[in-house]
Curated annotation (Swiss-Prot):
NCBIfam families referenced in this protein's UniProt entry, alphabetically: F_box_assoc_1 (TIGR01640)
Protein name: Putative F-box protein At1g53550
Organism placement in taxonomy: Eukaryota, Viridiplantae, Streptophyta, Embryophyta, Tracheophyta
Disulfide bonds: none
Family matches, as Pfam families: F-box, FBA_3
F-box domain segment(s): 29-74
């Protein structure tokens, strides 16, 4: 019986076959015919998200196929197409990402969160909302401030070019830097907006605005112009239909909502309602309210919701809901922050620690608030990975998180 020998060239993933007799042994060695690239793509398209992530390391060819910008559109990965909840816990100097189903069973008041990936929190200071499965986080390392773009599902991350936090010259000092993260659905591009506050002299303030586009090759910051000096507040914003909305303070100390078109990289501004005084509150959140920008705050007794009905006309609608639970029933040691609205129309709320309190998140919970029925349901989270720690903090909760195999 003839022996068959398989030879694989890892660089090009071609498995060849030919009949060739050895001149020394007289034995015949068989090789396989090349596997068409289309067949390789077809095989990859049948794999799960986890398998796809591992297959990137098989060879350069497989990696290049999966890295194609339109790969996920041509061959949808068998990942969870259902939006999920994303929980970010901080343990010591690490951030742990966990996800769970977004909808809960009324007969079971708990959700089981599965562990995704973790990342070092090197003086972690801010986390932007997920955009198509990717997350932008802000970190400080020695005298440098930088952002990480990470994929909680695959564990892949990339550090963006750093900025040194020191004097730019003898008179200019960087006071603060904020990042926002958006996505252009037309050109299918992820972009990061960086706003730097500058202090010149004793009273002169200004801002610099830079944009970075994720993609192949070298990535770098480029300057963009904005005719109105503004300062990004603590909320990093939310991207809805290609527009990045974020709250800001103007040079005259008034507040506004900035609308940054991710594709054109142009700024516009929407005035807030004269009665809208919630933007500086700790529990202030921007949400996607049925495709419109929503701004909300929860003070344990009232839920205040503003919806931007028309950005050009600066028209807002206001709704006030009397919450059915008292402050004591809703964990008076913490503030409640809005994680977003899900398809069922329910608002998700989660506790965050105030300046004087600290909530142990090894036993986390969230609330589902049905606005129409005015019913709040408390749901506990089962997070097995947290059992190995003595203390953890729930930093963020996000709704409508979609797993993504996108490489960065």
């Amino acid at each position: 019986m003839r022996k068959r020998k398989q030879q694989v060239y890892n660089d090009n993933l071609i498995v060849s076959r030919s009949n060739k007799r050895s001149s020394t042994s007289g034995k015949e060695t068989c090789y396989f015919d090349p596997i068409p690239v289309d067949l390789v793509i077809n095989i990859l398209s049948r794999l799960s998200l986890e398998c796809i992530a591992r297959c990137r390391c098989v060879s350069k060819l497989w990696s290049s196929i999966i890295r194609r910008p339109n790969y996920n559109q041509l061959f949808p990965v068998k990942s969870s197409a259902t939006p999920r909840l994303l929980f970010v816990f901080k343990v010591a100097r690490e951030l742990f990402f966990n996800s769970s189903p977004q909808h809960f069973n009324p007969n079971n008041s708990s959700l089981v969160a599965t562990s995704l990936q973790k990342t070092s929190s090197t003086r972690f200071s801010q986390l932007c909302r997920p955009v198509h499965g990717l997350i932008c986080s802000q970190h400080i390392e020695e005298n440098y401030l930088f952002a990480l773009i990470s994929n909680p599902t695959t564990g892949e991350y990339i550090a963006l070019p750093k900025q040194r936090m020191e004097e730019m010259n003898s008179e200019t000092i960087i006071e603060k830097v904020r990042y926002s993260f958006g996505y252009d659905p037309i050109d299918k591009q992820f972009k990061v907006l960086r706003i730097t506050w500058l202090h010149r002299g004793s009273h002169e303030w200004s801002s610099e605005y830079q944009v970075l586009t994720l993609g192949f090759g070298n990535i770098s910051w480029r300057n963009t112009q904005c005719c109105v000096v503004h300062y990004l507040l603590e909320d990093s914003g939310i991207c809805i239909n290609g527009v990045l909305y974020y709250p800001a303070r103007l040079d005259n100390r008034k507040y506004t909502i900035v609308c940054f078109d991710v594709m054109t990289e142009k700024f516009s501004f929407t005035s807030i309602d004269k009665d809208m005084t919630i933007m500086t509150n700790l529990s202030f959140s921007l949400i996607d309210y049925k495709g419109k920008l929503g701004a909300c705050i929860c003070d344990h007794t009232l839920f205040e919701l503003w919806v931007l009905e028309n950005a050009e006309e600066h028209k807002w609608s206001k709704n006030i809901y009397n919450m059915p639970y008292s402050r004591s029933r809703l964990e008076e040691t913490s503030y409640l922050k809005c994680a977003g609205m899900i398809a069922s129309g329910e608002i998700l709320l989660y506790p965050i620690s105030s300046a004087n309190t600290s909530t142990d998140a090894r036993y986390p919970f969230i609330y589902y608030y049905n606005l129409e029925r005015n019913i709040i349901t408390r749901v506990t989270l089962q997070v097995p990975i947290l059992k190995q720690f003595t203390y953890a903090r729930l930093f963020y909760t996000f709704s409508n998180f979609l797993e993504n195999v996108t490489l960065i």
